[in-house]
Design a protein with these regions (language model features):
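A conserved beta-strand-loop-helix scaffold within acyl/acetyltransferase catalytic domains
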Residues: 6-50, 54-67, 115, 120, ...
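Active-site/acyl-donor-binding loops of N-acyltransferases
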Residues: 7-8, 119-168, 344-406
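Catalytic phosphate/metal-binding cores of nucleic-acid and nucleotide-processing enzymes, i.e., regions
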Residues: 72
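The substrate-binding groove and active-site-proximal loops of carbohydrate-active enzymes
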Residues: 75-83, 122-123
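Acidic-and-aromatic substrate-binding clefts and catalytic sites of carbohydrate-active enzymes
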Residues: 79-85, 356-360
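Conserved acetyl-CoA-binding loop-helix of GNAT-fold acetyltransferases
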Residues: 84-96, 327-340
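Conserved GNAT acetyl-CoA-binding A-motif
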Residues: 99-119, 343-354
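Short, contiguous acidic/charged loop-to-helix segments that flank catalytic cores in large enzymes
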Residues: 320-329, 354-358
């Protein structure tokens, strides 16, 4: 069969194909090309003899000094990798297009799964077909960049936490997660979906997270760009607290405990100890809430998360929390609510993003709270369109990225 490589597919046709594909991913959407304003997007595709689209790829192009440039396909291209004719035709067409544009290197990040397991089932075994795909891509001239475990070696993480839609999603959550949700409710925190007007408060939470973890994330303008690109498919969840209402409820609870202590018979020391512990806990919380009320007023932000629905998947992109409310585990409530609502809308899965491949850090432990599979893909492959200067450009890019992380 003959195939035709398409250098510029209209966005509507492009998204129609990608949204229905089993390898659908937000980072391969036409909208993501709009969000990445410091890259030039190309919506490429492959067409068969009947005129049907059989492969697609969002190419992000970036220029460097001395006329050099890189193309990058995050989590792409989108195609059936078991159909070798389609795979090879698209990837060869991509390189021909890159040569035409005088690109230095092309970097792909195929959604080929090497391993997909619950945390407790790791390391398990890898899919032998993944290695076969690597070898087939290498035969086309692509250079595999290895199976790195850290987050810094690749542009997008090789390991992602993905929770799948099941009928018993909530029942299968760890007891710890359910306890944290109850704890958040008992602290009178409310979680709800908000509109675009909540982005300013969300950006505040992200700044708090950046300062607390000494990392650089994104600013409000970037979140606005996401909203511009995806509109009603953008979901912002915020956890807030009415401190005055919370104080009223806790003072009432404390009064009830005090009354129980007064009414308690003298020969019940065990029950008295339990009530005294409750009394001290309520008083400690009341003191803290009074401090917060004096400093920040009645209505305060606790935590938030921003996600986007694309095709049949929901991607939780960013999350942050107010460090002064760090004792309230509101993020668990936000994540679970966003997942439940996504599944009710028919989403097949929710991704909470990348984790280190060692699977032994705090980020992995947190994301494991939502019963995900930790999905490992084969990672990046480079095609040196200009072999003589390819290594020099890669070295320069890596050095720049290393300096940017300091």
């Amino acid at each position: 069969m003959e195939y035709k490589f398409i250098e510029a597919l209209p966005p509507l046709l492009y998204d129609t194909f990608v949204k229905k594909h089993k390898h659908c991913h937000l980072l391969q959407s036409a909208g993501w090309g709009e969000v990445k304003s410091n890259w030039t997007p190309y919506l490429t595709a492959l067409e068969n003899e009947e005129g049907d689209i059989v492969a697609a790829g969002l190419v992000l192009a970036r220029s460097f000094p001395l006329g050099q440039s890189m193309w990058y396909l995050p989590k792409g291209p989108v195609l059936d990798y078991e159909n070798h004719a389609v795979r090879d035709a698209y990837l060869k067409g991509l390189i021909a297009f890159a040569e035409k544009k005088r690109v230095t290197l092309v970097k792909i990040d195929p959604p080929i799964v090497r391993r997909s397991l619950m945390l407790e089932d790791y390391p398990g075994t890898t899919d032998p077909r993944a290695q076969e795909q690597i070898e087939a891509l290498e035969a086309l001239g692509y250079i595999h960049q290895g199976l790195s475990l850290d987050l810094e070696s690749t542009i997008q993480p090789r390991f992602s936490a993905i929770t799948y839609n099941t009928a018993d999603f909530y029942e299968q959550l760890p007891k710890r997660t359910k306890r944290f949700i109850r704890d958040t409710e008992n602290r009178f925190v409310t979680v709800s979906r908000e509109g675009r007007e909540g982005l300013e408060d969300f950006a505040f939470l992200i700044r708090q997270t950046e300062e607390n973890k000494d990392i650089t994330l994104r600013d409000q303008a970037y979140f606005e760009a996401i909203w511009d690109a995806f509109g009603d498919d953008t979901y912002l969840y915020m956890a807030r607290i009415d401190v005055v209402y919370a104080l009223e409820q806790m003072q009432q609870q404390l009064a009830e405990v005090n009354q129980k202590l007064e009414d308690l018979p003298p020969n019940t020391p065990k029950k008295r100890r339990q009530l005294v512990i409750q009394q001290e806990s309520y008083q400690k919380q009341i003191d803290f809430f009074n401090e917060r009320l004096a400093e920040e007023g009645q209505h305060q932000i606790v935590a938030g998360a921003l996600g986007v629905e694309y095709g049949h998947v929901f991607e939780l992109l960013y999350a942050g929390r107010n460090t002064v409310w760090g004792r309230i585990p509101a993020q668990d409530s936000i994540y679970v609510m966003s997942m439940q609502e996504a599944f009710e809308r028919g989403m097949t899965s929710v991704s909470t993003g990348g984790v280190p491949g060692t699977l032994d850090d705090g980020l992995t432990k947190f994301k494991a709270s939502f019963s995900p599979h930790f999905v490992e893909t084969i990672g990046e492959l480079d095609y040196p369109v200009k072999p003589l200067i390819y290594r020099g450009l890669v070295t320069a890019i890596n050095l720049r990225n290393k300096l940017a992380r300091r």
